[in-house]
Amino acid sequence: SIMFSDFAGFTKHVEHMEPKALIELLNQYFSAFDKIIFNHKLEKIKTIGDAYMCASGLPAESRGHAIRICLGALEIQNFLERSNEKREKMRMQRWDMRIGIHTGPVIAGVVGERKFTYDIWGDSVNIAALMEQHGEPGRINISETTYQQVSEIFETENRGSINSGKKGDLPMYFLNRLKEEFSEDPDGIKANSVFQQKFGGLMKIYDA
């Protein structure tokens, strides 16, 4: 499973920012994301400007990779919302993200000679990017294949489809939260003991 995210209206945000302040702010956000995805055993792929990309189910396998990445995305979204609440109290502009997730096969490997980079390629990467591009600020947009693997666990919203050209119509869903019976907190961000009992086996990581 692949997650793409970027800040909505980034160009407008940075027009009046000093370079040092921008770098410090991006570092603050991306460092927080790094901690979140580490806790969910996700693999950071790269950052490009204001975009952040990670994946689940590689390099070590996990049958619950789609669940893991959705839990990570919800926690990232929750972190951003708490951050924006603080910014609004200080009369500062909100920084909202569009997050897109797709589940499917990818090619993964290390490339380069002097500066090695672990990266992923394939149609699944492109579809994850489309999910992000056609999302909304402050929301998590998931594909049909991700939805099929997580709909028993999370509350979702059907959004209809987008036409992707070669791939035809791609159904999309908003991922809102964990279902109440699986949630430890009122916001549906953290999984509870009922979730662990029912889905704990799926969440195991198997070394490749």
Regions found by a protein language model. Name each.
Residues S1-K12, D50:
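Catalytic-site or vestigial catalytic-site microsegments of nucleotide-handling domains
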Residues M3, K20-K41, G72-E75:
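Active-site-proximal alpha-helical element of nucleotidyl cyclase-like catalytic domains
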Residues S5, I36-R68, R82-V125, Q149, ...:
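Catalytic core of nucleotidyl cyclases, primarily class III adenylyl/guanylyl cyclases
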Residues F10, Y29, F33, Y52:
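Hydrophobic framework residues that shape the active-site pocket
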Residues H13-L25, K44, R68:
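Conserved catalytic/dimerization core of cyclic nucleotide/dinucleotide signaling enzymes
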Residues F30, D34, Q77-N84, P105, ...:
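Structural signal for well-ordered, non-membrane alpha-helices
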Residues V106-A108, H134-A208:
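Cytosolic regulatory/linker segments at or just downstream of nucleotide-handling modules
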